[in-house]
Every structure is written in structure tokens, then in C-alpha cells.
């Protein structure tokens, strides 16, 4: 059964401007430990790839927070939710700490879809309850 649905669109140019103003502090605030490694790797290769990665993760976390109905209120936080790719390339949501506990207690599972173009990143998240 569907528990919640969330979507978000992010202007990659705004992410670039924020990074320019605040440096890596913005990325370090939004990304979890494994995400920050991927961000730095992609950004070192091609700046635009790093920006797209950060924007899609920002967008996905916004969409996820909407789908679970908490917004960015505890136990939801930027770093307690990581969007990491499976070996197949499929994005998957990995939760940590109190958010992981909250999610498991409700027997929820999440599905995420990401896409980006030159100026925009969008995300769609469906959260459903697991069958009893």
C-alpha cells in the first residue's frame, strides 16, 4: 500500500551559486559520508558532473522527506538519508540512525527515480508499506 509520494525539482544553477558562496560546506551539510566521496570524485573529473550529482541528491532528499510526511524535521535530516547507486546504477535510499529506526518501525520501503539535464535535476519517491 502506498504510504506517501514526493517529488522535487532543483535548479542546478542555484546549487552552483551556493557552492560558489559557501564552498564545500554546503555539500558537507547535505551529503552523507559515502555521498560526499562520490561527489568529490565526480567533481574532480568534471565540475558539471559533481554539480549534477549534488543537485540530484538534494532533490531526492527533498522528495523523500515529502513522501514520508516529515519534511526536514527529526528524525529526517540531510545526512541521515543517502542516495547511493547500486552496481546496476539504480539509485537506492540508505537510511541511518534514528531515521532508519523510524522507517523500520513503520515497515516502510522506498523507491526513488532521479534525472537531470543541463539546468535541472528532478526526483520522484514512492514510499510503501511492506505486506504483513
Curated annotation (Swiss-Prot):
Taxonomic classification: Bacteria, Pseudomonadati, Pseudomonadota, Betaproteobacteria, Burkholderiales
Gene giving rise to this polypeptide: acpS
Molecular function terms from GO: holo-[acyl-carrier-protein] synthase activity; magnesium ion binding
Primary location class: cytoplasm
Family: Belongs to the P-Pant transferase superfamily. AcpS family.
Disulfide linkage: none
EC number(s) on file: 2.7.8.7
Function: Transfers the 4'-phosphopantetheine moiety from coenzyme A to a Ser of acyl-carrier-protein.
GO cellular component: cytoplasm
GO process terms (BP): fatty acid biosynthetic process
Subcellular location: Cytoplasm
Domain of life according to the entry: Bacteria
Catalytic activity: apo-[ACP] + CoA = holo-[ACP] + adenosine 3',5'-bisphosphate + H(+)
Protein name: Holo-[acyl-carrier-protein] synthase
HAMAP family in the record: AcpS
Coiled-coil intervals: none
Residues reported to bind Mg(2+): 8, 62
Keywords: Cytoplasm, Fatty acid biosynthesis, Fatty acid metabolism, Lipid biosynthesis, Lipid metabolism, Magnesium, Metal-binding, Transferase
SUPFAM superfamilies the record matches: 4'-phosphopantetheinyl transferase
Cofactor(s) named in the record: Mg(2+)
InterPro entries in the cross-refs: 4-PPantetheinyl_Trfase_dom (IPR008278), 4-PPantetheinyl_Trfase_dom_sf (IPR037143), ACPS (IPR002582), Ppantetheine-prot_Trfase_dom (IPR004568)
